[in-house]
Amino acid sequence: MRASCSTKDLYHGIQIASRAIAGRSAWPILNSILIQTEDDHLRLTAFDLELGIECTVPAEIEQKGSLAVPARLAGDVLSSFPQSAVSISASELDINLKCENSNYTLRGLPPDEFRPLPDIPNDRSFQITQGALRNMIMQTIFAASSDESRAILTGVLLVLGDAEVKLVATDTNRLAVRSAVVPLSSENTSPCIVPRRAMDELSRLIEDTDDPVTVSIADSQIKFVVNGVTLVSRLIEGQFPNYERVIPTEYTRKLTIPTDEFLTKVRRASIVARESANRVILRVQDDILTLTAESGDVGKAYEELEIVREGEDIEIAFNAKFLIDFLSVVGTEGIFMELTEPLRQAVMKPVGQEGYIYVLMPMQIR
């Protein structure tokens, strides 16, 4: 194998592919990137058997070939090279990287030890804009559970409906549901559970543009193609909880709250609240919302802001972090908070935007 390309481009490609490498594996091949020559580019692939990422780098190919190289080592070497052309050559299991007066030889692995990415057909696929998918991920992924003993809840449910795509995440204390209108041509609309890690890495690849992301789904795998990068992930097996039954359909109180001011005050109150299970107490009286937090070891916090209220006064407590997570990504000037009783779940929605619902369980006030 002999090729040359921009050091910057090759380093960037290795950085992208390396995101599929979760950590130090006992099998060196799972810590490696497969480099393959093709007509006018290098194809870089990393795959840890759960998540795989493949991208290409423009290159001049002199001699075709392939070799698996340690991802971290190759990235560290390239990051220290000057920003000029790098020559790549391989013989047997050694890969040589030469840039100006620097010359490094790294020990690689046989390419036939590298497991290829799963082949996922496009017969069950759809397209969505990068900006729309990025917002959907950011507005749901934070609600997924981090408890690995409940594997199903560590993922994000992807639901395909009538001209609609929906993402759902829950850790049982809160639920985030985000939908978007998308033309769907496939008749197979079975829901699937995408691992949080895959969604997190995908969100790093997509941009806030109208360019498309192509999503293809198989029985146990899902594929995303964006900006010339392919991300493949294994799906989580199992039955996702019936999330629709926990979304209240009625309310007795409705608050209209300015998002930025509310977020600022919750963040400030959380400085004290984090010493008392992150509890902040919301009290509604007339058109004033007060926030209080108290810790015997730290002190007290008090905030107030003007709101628009429908219904009677109420006192209810929430986890401050769970409020902050939603308010940080809602993206509108105001939110609606729909309430019934102090120990019943609350529903929060953006003002002036359809398709986003956040359900939050309250905490005991005392």
Descriptions of predicted regions:
Residues M1-R366:
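Structural preference for solvent-exposed beta-strand-turn elements
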